[in-house]
């Protein structure tokens, strides 16, 4: 069982490291997403600028990416001694990791989904409400934001995988029951 637990710890450490890297990459792309253009209005030019902080959905995604990256790094640092065989998180610690993996997956999924809706409206517009598409003018901004959102969805998938790995570690270590441990009784009709 010790090798199996170290295997789970190894998988967990690797996936957590990858998740933190993906979240940080998404965060950097979103923080760098800014574009300024000059638009012709009559005989004059007007300067327009767009950045991530103009929309609350993108700000929510920034904070969610920060939260996921920090959480993964903190848990990663805490799991390194366990992977080396020096100490293992107790039942309460494993439950906390299991729950937070799921909660943060849902938080990041909500943030990435709301940012996707805003990016869709920026790309397509909405004729019924007279919202015009801004991506034709701010193409670089839109491409950068979409890359960031895509990385956030990758991080969501990695967090979901982490939830499975942490559940396997938790239930495999503390709630193991042998398969078919209870003998079934049956009556024969004679």
Curated annotation (Swiss-Prot):
The protein's name in its UniProt record: CASP-like protein 2U2
Pfam families given in the database record:
CASP_dom
Family membership noted in the UniProt record = Belongs to the Casparian strip membrane proteins (CASP) family.
What PANTHER family would the database entry show? CASP-LIKE PROTEIN 4A4
Among InterPro entries, the record links this protein to: CASP/CASPL, CASP_dom
The chain's Cytoplasmic topological domains, given as residue ranges, are 1-10, 81-94, 166-190
Q: Which residue windows are transmembrane per the record?
A: 11-31, 60-80, 95-115, 145-165
**Per the UniProt entry, what species is this protein from, by scientific name?**
Pteridium aquilinum subsp. aquilinum
Location relative to the cell: Cell membrane
Q: What is its main location?
A: membrane
Please give the subunit comment from the record: Homodimer and heterodimers.
Q: How does it sit in the membrane?
A: Multi-pass membrane protein
Which keywords label this protein?
Cell membrane, Membrane, Transmembrane, Transmembrane helix
Q: Which residues lie on this side of the membrane: Extracellular?
A: 32-59, 116-144
Tell me where on the tree of life, at the top rank, the source sits.
Eukaryota
Q: Which GO terms describe its cellular component?
A: plasma membrane
């Amino acid at each position: 069982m010790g090798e199996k637990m170290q295997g789970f710890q190894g998988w967990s450490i690797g996936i957590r490291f990858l998740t933190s890297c993906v979240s940080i990459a998404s965060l950097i792309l979103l923080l760098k997403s800014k574009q300024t253009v000059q638009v012709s209005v009559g005989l004059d030019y007007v300067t327009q600028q767009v950045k991530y902080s103009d929309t609350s959905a993108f700000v929510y995604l920034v904070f969610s990416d920060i939260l996921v990256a920090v959480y993964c790094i903190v848990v990663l640092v805490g799991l390194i001694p366990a992977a080396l065989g020096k100490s293992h998180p107790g039942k309460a610690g494993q439950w906390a990791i299991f729950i937070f993996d799921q909660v943060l997956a849902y938080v990041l999924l909500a943030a990435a989904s709301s940012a996707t809706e805003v990016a869709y409206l920026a790309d397509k517009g909405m004729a019924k409400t007279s919202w015009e598409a801004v991506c034709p003018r701010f193409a670089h901004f839109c491409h950068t934001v979409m890359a960031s959102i895509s990385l956030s969805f990758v991080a969501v998938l990695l967090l979901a995988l982490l939830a499975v790995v942490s559940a396997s570690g938790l239930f495999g270590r503390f709630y193991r029951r042998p398969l078919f441990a209870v003998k079934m009784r049956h009556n024969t009709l004679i």
